[in-house]
Amino acid sequence: MEKTMFKSLSEIKQSYLELLKKIDDPEVISNIKEYSAINKEIAKIREISEKFITYENILKDVEQAKIMLESKNEEEVEFAKMIIDENSLKLDELEEKLKILILPQDENDDKNIIVEIRGAAGGDEANIFAGDLFRMYSKFADELGFRLKILSTNSASAGGFSQIVFSIKGEKAYSKFKFESGVHRVQRVPVTESQGRIHTSTTTVTVMPEIDDSVEIEIKPSDLKIDVFRSSGAGGQSVNTTDSAVRITHLPTNIVVTSQDERSQIANRETALTILKSKLYDLEMQKKAEEESGYRKLAGHGDRSEKIRTYNYPQDRVTDHRISFSTSLKPIMEGKLTPIIDALLAEEQNQKIKESGF
C-alpha cells in the first residue's frame, strides 16, 4: 500500500476511534442533536475504518511471520511461509476494497432527489416516452423500497407528459439515480404512425438533490415573481375552481417552476419553492462541473444536452453511450436498472481511482 494512502486511512481510523469515545460521553448522550450528528459521522467512516483495522492486524501477522523465516526450526519456517501466503492474498483484497472506500464521495449521494422529465424533440412521441420513463423510474424506485411522490405534472393530450416533476425518498437515493441526467433517445414506431416507420424522439431527464437543512440556498423575496392560476388537466381542462396553482419565476436565472397538484395554494407554493431550491443548487453543481472533469461529468453534472442513452425498440436494445454498455430493453423498461447503474458506478470508481493517484 502506498504511503499517502496508508497515512490517509490512519487519519480516518483515528477520527473514528475518537468519535466512538465521544459518543459514550454522558453529556453527548443527553444532547439528542449532538448524539445524532456524531452517529451520522461514525456511520460514514465505520466501514472504511473497520476494514483498515483488519488490514493493520493482518499486516502485523505477516510482519511477525517474516521474522519467523529466520528461525532455524524448519517447521516454524514452513508455518511462517503459510501465514505469509494466506495473508498476502487477504491484504491485496482488502487494499482493493479500501482504494474504493477512500475515494472522494459525492456530497449528494445520501440525499433524496427531485426528478424532472420533459418531452423534447419528437412531439407527441417524445411526451409519450416521457411517460414511459416515469413508469420505468417508478418501478425502479419501488424495487429499491423508495417512496415516490408526484410534485408537478403537465399531461400531454396524446398521452404521457410534456413535463413531470417528482420526488424520490430513500437511502442514498441520489447515488442510485444521479447517472440518469441527460438526453434519452427512443427509436420505435409510434402509436400515431400509420405506415410503420421508425421515428427517433428525445426526452430530457434532470436528477437534482433535494435540498435539506444542511444546505443554505439564499432566495430573496424580491427575486421572485409569483403567479397563481387554476389547476388544469390534460388538454387544458380546469380541474379546480379556485386559483390554487402556483408559478414561481426566479428573476436572476429566469428559472420557472410550477405546482398545481397539491390541494391548496399554500401547499403548491411550498412545493414550488422546494423544486426551485433544488434547481438553483443543481445550477451551482453544473457550474462547478464545468471546472472539473471525469466522474462529475459522468454523473450528469456536465453538459445536459449530451445524449446519454438510446432505447431501440425494434432491436430490443438499450445502449448507454457513456460506457458503450448495451443490454436487453424490456427488463430496463420494467425498472430493472441495476445492471446499467452498476456498470456506470464501476466506471465512476475507475475514474476516481485515476484522479486520486492511488
Swiss-Prot record:
Q: Where is the signal peptide?
A: none
The reply to whether Protein biosynthesis figures as a keyword in the UniProt entry is: yes
Q: What is its main location?
A: cytoplasm
Query: Known post-translational modifications?
Result: Methylated by PrmC. Methylation increases the termination efficiency of RF1.
Q: Where is this region: Disordered?
A: 291-313
Which PROSITE patterns does the annotation name? RF_PROK_I (PS00745)
Keywords, A to Z, come to: Cytoplasm, Methylation, Protein biosynthesis
Tell me the InterPro entries matching this sequence: PCRF, Pep_chain_release_fac_I, Pep_chain_release_fac_I_sf, Prokaryotic/Mito_RF, RF-1
Is-annotated flag, keyword Membrane? no
| Pfam family of the protein (one) | RF-1
Spell out the GO cellular component terms annotated for this protein, sorted alphabetically and separated by semicolons.
cytoplasm
Name the job this protein performs. Answer: Peptide chain release factor 1 directs the termination of translation in response to the peptide chain termination codons UAG and UAA.
Q: According to its UniProt record, which protein family does this protein belong to?
A: Belongs to the prokaryotic/mitochondrial release factor family.
Q: Which HAMAP family match?
A: Rel_fac_1
Q: Would you tell me the protein name for this molecule?
A: Peptide chain release factor 1
What lineage does the source organism belong to? Bacteria, Bacillati, Mycoplasmatota, Mycoplasmoidales, Metamycoplasmataceae
The primary gene name is prfA
